[in-house]
Amino acid sequence: MATPNVVLIVYDQLAASWLEAGLRGAADLPNFARLAGQGTYFSRCFSTNPVCSPARASIATGLRSSAHGVMQLGYALSPELPTFMGALSEAGWHTAACGKLHLRPHWESLEPDYRPYGFSEQHITEDPRGGAWLDWVRAEHPEHFRAVLTTIWAREMDEFSEYGPQRENLAELMAGLPMPGNVYELPFPARVSQSNWITDRALDSIASTPPGQSLLCQIGYVQPHNPYAPPRGFRRFVNFDYVPEPVPAAWRDDPLTPPAFNARAAVAEKHEWRAVREHYFADMVHLDRQLGRVLDGLADAGRERDTYVIALADHGDLLLDHGLIYKDSFHYDACVRVPLLISGPGLAQGQVCDDLAAIEDIYPTILEAAGLPCPRPDERRPVPGQPTAPFCAGRSLLELARGRTPADWREAVFIESFNNLDSRLPGNWVKTVRTADARYSLYGEGAGEQLFDLAADPDEQENLAADPTHRRFRQQMRDLLLQHLLVERYPHPPRDLFRLGVH
């Protein structure tokens, strides 16, 4: 094979449930279908901490939150931890980051520096919308600058008070501008949007990388994360006859439900599900067009045959399923199951893989694609200042993408949340074990638990945790969760000092 390349596309808050509904006819998504036809769609891929920063840290490191330390929003990933971009950079690859990475807190800076993690080129724009994209809008599309400012929700960030080299007070300017809410169409053309700008920068990186130079291009889109704001003209590509209605909030009558559910339900009640889903699906259509541009750009650059394309999301969005919205510690399917598509040289085409995958599998998958040593799940990796590193939780998915399932492939994935934006109480901490046909979630401080037989109850409506007829089922799932916690909490002594026969 010629020099390999990797394009990693990370969508923000894109649930597998909604992409699959779109592909069944709810939205016009020819390029997602195109990528699925060129590779493998993993139908059971899970976010192991369904919130932005922790999930993205797991993608980068192959570790779960309890190992890499990014527990929730507001945490920064240590640049000392091994990452796939760092490994590829050390191996001589050109490494480019375009769009959203969110490995550091948004409030830290409008222009975060991700070069310490291993990127040699970066074009960053994230949720606060300041920085490179905003500066480009002002320079190239000044007629839309004020319209863009109306969509900035993080107006209280200090940097907006002394913005840019001229130290302009954009905060004062924005204070006089209306905000459009949480469901709207962008008040400027699609060509000016963050998503288009991110794709433009990625295409520039692909086109400008010299032939023969291996390229890693990570493309991070800010959408379809709320606010649900597609460009104008894309709602017409949504066929509402195929958009599913929200599943009922059966937890309201369940005494084992944690209190945090009520707080999030109060947020959800302010939204009308038809409007939310229509705008969300329209944003998927816009992202589909960006995917098509990326795939075409690889072909134009002569890199199509030698490039692994990996597309996934950090977590999902409930979109009013179960009377809830967004993500966090509500481990229903639309929150934790994410789309994952992988195509590349030597991989199966048009395949659907039902084996369990997790976002921490991306790290070893990229290393194997690059021909670099791939850590085993039981292999420690050195970290500066520490004699040993945490277990690598991920496994390469390339064997599955070739159509072969290893005999020792996992039978469960583990999901954790440590708090959410509604509360920091341990009662909102939750540990979940998810198998192919069951889910068990245990909340902290006795706040509640959930047990679902997904084969009989795919919509997760009947909590069996307190049902005496399912006591054995509950115990089996609790034991599976306990075994995971025992292994994950294995102490990290200085084993490099150990010598056989020394006590």
Q: What is each stretch, according to the model?
A:
Residues 63-188:
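Catalytic-site neighborhoods of secreted/periplasmic enzymes
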